[in-house]
Design a protein with these regions (language model features):
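Divalent-metal-activated hydrolytic enzyme cores
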Residues: 1-36, 68-92, 103-222
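Short beta-strand segments
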Residues: 41-43, 65, 95-99, 179-184
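Glycine/charged-rich beta-loop-alpha catalytic/anionic-binding loops adjacent to active sites
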Residues: 58-69
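Gly/Ser/Thr-rich loops at beta-strand to alpha-helix junctions
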Residues: 45-47, 99-104
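N-terminal short beta-loop-beta anion/metal-coordinating cradle
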Residues: 19-60
């Protein structure tokens, strides 16, 4: 058993002691329930941990992570997380966060057989196909990778918006709002891509409307 593994439990002990020293009831209150305002959908990369980069405390962020922060509506795992967060936790914000130097995005741009990863990365290859003209015009390979990371976040945000539970709650309560972020590993900063949530709603509702209502007008006339 490696020393680094044992350190985990030592670190946990110190963390517990520090929390109890700050607030003796911390874990008693934490165990009761959770009321996060945020659903964070991010990459599984070990360098991009949600709570740390957001400066969030336990109970403040509901987190789902996978390779390259993909939201595939045929994937029961991601759709179940989103539906639970929207309908039961009543989150107000859904954040899709990618990061530069993403291995999953780079793998999707590599012409090779990656076995079981192939169907997963196909979602990102589809993003490239949708934006091929723009991406192919970027001569610098690293900048092209960075741009694909951003476009992947954008398209995954759209996949979130396509879900019926997101549409229905937005009409009723004006939430959740979907945001697209990129975490820059080179600087440690979060970049808000400032995705226009309402414009996307308006642009895609003719095809992806699952509620029978005009999303934007229903909200404005309440």
């Amino acid at each position: 058993m490696s020393q680094s593994y044992e350190v985990i439990f030592e670190n946990n002990k110190k963390w517990v002691e520090s929390k109890v020293a700050e607030d003796p009831d911390f874990f008693h209150e934490l165990a009761k329930t959770q009321h996060p305002d945020y659903l964070y959908i991010g990459c599984s990369d070990s360098r991009a941990t949600a709570e740390e980069l957001m400066g969030a405390k336990p109970g403040e962020v509901f987190v789902y992570r996978n390779i390259a922060n993909v939201v595939n509506t045929l994937d029961m795992s991601s759709t179940a997380v989103i539906q639970y967060a929207v309908e039961h936790l009543k989150v107000k914000h859904i954040i899709v966060c990618g990061h530069y130097n993403c291995g999953g995005v780079k793998a999707a741009m590599t012409p090779q057989d990656l076995g079981l990863l192939n169907p997963w990365l196909r979602t990102i290859r589809d993003v490239y196909r949708l934006h091929q003209t723009e991406l192919d015009s970027i001569e610098d390979e690293n900048k092209r990778y960075d741009r694909l990371v951003e476009l992947n976040v954008q398209e995954q945000c759209i996949n979130v918006i396509k879900m019926a539970c997101v549409q229905e709650r937005y009409i009723l309560e004006e939430y959740p709002i979907v945001h697209g972020w990129v975490f820059d590993l080179r600087t440690g900063k979060i970049i808000d891509l400032e995705i226009d949530f309402e414009k996307i709603l308006k642009d895609i509702q003719k095809i992806y409307n699952l509620t029978g209502s005009d999303w934007v007008m229903s909200r404005k006339t309440k």
